[in-house]
């Protein structure tokens, strides 16, 4: 085993990387409220794992979406547990994200030189809410359908481009299969990749600049 480790160590300097990660200075003023961002990340990882599991059974069509969700809940082994964890961790992720934003704001973590860290955090907050909006529609039940209809109709109030934005979101003049397909694509592909990119940027900035000091 040591020979295997030595082989990787010689090429990748694993120990130096581990020492850099574990030896980062933590200011004495840091308390449990500084863990809210990490908890949000943990919720996202749970979301990713449970969501990925459900993609094996979910069918993104207006005719089969609701039935496929019922199949997950009633027929798939531990499907009810996987979907329940997905649902509750989604709520927890939004709550922890909101508390994290408040903590950063109240402790002045957005001030120079951490403005870009704050900007990426705001983008992450928007993406998190977008996850909730798109995911809410996927069961395609009465609640999901009318939620999509209301949310996708909101841009209509924007002058000049409002109607075009509504049609872009819905994939047509009315809510239907094209809408569900777009929301499913956003929820399972576009938003996950987007949040991964901005999370990486966010964490690299935190790693570089460290945790902000006390007020």
From Swiss-Prot:
Binding site residues for heme b 2: 86, 187
Co-factor remark: Binds 2 heme b groups non-covalently with two histidine residues as axial ligands. Binds one heme group covalently by a single cysteine link with no axial amino acid ligand. This heme was named heme ci.
Membrane-protein topology: Multi-pass membrane protein
One Pfam family recorded for the sequence: Cytochrome_B
InterPro entries, alphabetized: Cyt_b/b6_N, Cyt_B6_PetB, Cytb/b6-like_sf, Cytochrome_b_N_euk/bac, Di-haem_cyt_TM
Positions annotated to bind heme c: 35
Taxonomic superkingdom: Bacteria
Cofactor(s) in the UniProt record: heme b; heme c
Keyword Electron transport attributed: yes
Transmembrane segments: 32-52, 90-110, 116-136, 186-206
Reported function: Component of the cytochrome b6-f complex, which mediates electron transfer between photosystem II (PSII) and photosystem I (PSI), cyclic electron flow around PSI, and state transitions.
Family per record: Belongs to the cytochrome b family. PetB subfamily.
Subunit relationships: The 4 large subunits of the cytochrome b6-f complex are cytochrome b6, subunit IV (17 kDa polypeptide, PetD), cytochrome f and the Rieske protein, while the 4 small subunits are PetG, PetL, PetM and PetN. The complex functions as a dimer.
PANTHER family xrefs: CYTOCHROME B
Name of the protein this chain belongs to: Cytochrome b6
